[in-house]
């Protein structure tokens, strides 16, 4: 028995970063397992994540999941919630495991800050922001968010798919390293994000 992460956040209010870390680590373990079997979820959002009574978290609703090698794009029948879709999903392009990573990054962002990275008056306006905007850094909203955890979140949410984590396992490794040392400064991510900013017009 349990409730969705969406319900949990609504009841709990603002989540502590440590709890957010606990949840996202379990989410990425689930995605890493699915991706290792060639399965992409395509609709990662708090409504599809279950928080069980024992504090464990399960990724649910693989109803629109597809095999990674299937030539699938975003269709009318397979739309993820617009607040969590990746830029490539918004463009209707071919997607892979990195699209799930982007959506998981949005979920982490929402847990850390208590708000979504992009809001708008319509689904189209939100989708456009995923394509062209950079969200506020979590620490600009919540000063207690550790810099290393913020960097993990922002790398997962890179609009450029090639700047994102290459796999759920890679993101999970950084999360596990951070869990061991919350003072860890993931400098290599900072450099990658800086390079991205320098190359953007």
PLM feature spans:
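Regulatory extensions appended to serine/threonine kinase catalytic cores
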Residues: 185-201
């Amino acid at each position: 028995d349990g409730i969705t992460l969406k319900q949990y956040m609504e009841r709990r209010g603002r989540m502590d970063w440590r709890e957010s870390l606990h949840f996202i680590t379990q989410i990425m373990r689930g995605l890493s397992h699915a991706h290792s079997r060639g399965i992409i979820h395509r609709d990662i959002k708090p409504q599809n994540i279950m928080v069980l009574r024992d504090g464990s978290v399960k990724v649910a609703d693989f109803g629109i999941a597809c095999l990674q090698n299937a030539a699938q794009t975003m269709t009318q029948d397979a739309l993820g919630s617009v607040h969590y879709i990746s830029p490539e999903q918004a463009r209707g392009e071919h997607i892979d495991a990195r699209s799930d990573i982007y959506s998981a990054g949005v979920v982490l962002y929402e847990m850390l800050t208590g708000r979504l990275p992009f809001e708008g008056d319509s689904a189209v306006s939100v989708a456009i922001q995923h394509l062209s905007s950079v969200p506020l850094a979590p620490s600009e909203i919540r000063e207690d968010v550790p810099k290393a955890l913020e960097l993990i979140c922002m790398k997962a949410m890179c609009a450029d798919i090639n700047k994102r984590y290459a796999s759920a396992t890679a993101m999970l490794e950084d999360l596990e390293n951070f869990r061991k040392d919350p003072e860890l400064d993931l400098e290599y991510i900072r450099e990658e994000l800086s390079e991205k900013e320098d190359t953007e017009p």
